[in-house]
Each structure stands twice: as structure tokens, then as C-alpha cells.
């Protein structure tokens, strides 16, 4: 029975990874990957992915559809909570002042957190609410592309 559950979870994780990658986000799977991207000048949107229902039903669709906008971050990246633990922990080092939360979004500018959309701002909200929150961050911190 455990084997079937593990196979099922592997499929769920793979689907979640593919969905966010297809939307244009680059997966960061190590602490070094995280530092290499987040220490760069400019803006990076970090999506902290997870297998929970609000990630699949709200956060990932919002992550994809929010990109249909004039102002965008220079880099789109994702870490996977519970899967790529080292990368997720390293990303959270940049989220100063925020508790660990997944799914979530963090906008990093010049290596520093600007603002974060936490799980409580995603769970129980609809996709358009989260898209609007993301695009408000883009308006505030990003340039037209």
C-alpha cells in the first residue's frame, strides 16, 4: 500500500513541477541555485510550490496567468517545499520577516525581500484575487518588458 501511495505522490509532484515550469518558472533545486539567482541585481519572483490543494487550484494558475501583464519581474523561479528542502530553506533565508509558508510568492529585488504573498493570502481566495495581488507587486517593483 505504501508503494502505491509513493507512486501516486511522485506523480502529483511531477505534475506540479511540470505545471509551474510550463508557465515559465525556472526550478531551483539547490541552495547554490537559489543564491546564484536571488543575489543578482533586479527583480525575481519566487513561487514556493507545494502539493496542497490551494497550490494546484489557486497558486499555480495565478502564477501562470499573472504573467499576462505589461510589468514583470526579470526572473521567475520556483522552489518546492517538502521536495527540494535545501533550496526551499535557502530561499526562505531571503524572506526576512516572514514565517515559512507554502504555497507563497516572494518578490526579491537586488537580493532583498520587498513583499510576500503568503498562504493565508492564497488559501480561501480565488485565482483572480491572487493574480491581482501579484500584478500589484509587479506594478510597484517591476518595469515594463
From Swiss-Prot:
Taxonomy, superkingdom? Bacteria
- The UniProt transmembrane annotation reads none
A GO biological-process term? cell redox homeostasis
* Any single Pfam family the record assigns to this protein: Disulph_isomer
What InterPro entries does the database record attribute to this sequence? BrxB/BrxA
Q: Which family does it belong to?
A: Belongs to the bacilliredoxin family.
What protein am I looking at? Bacilliredoxin SERP1075
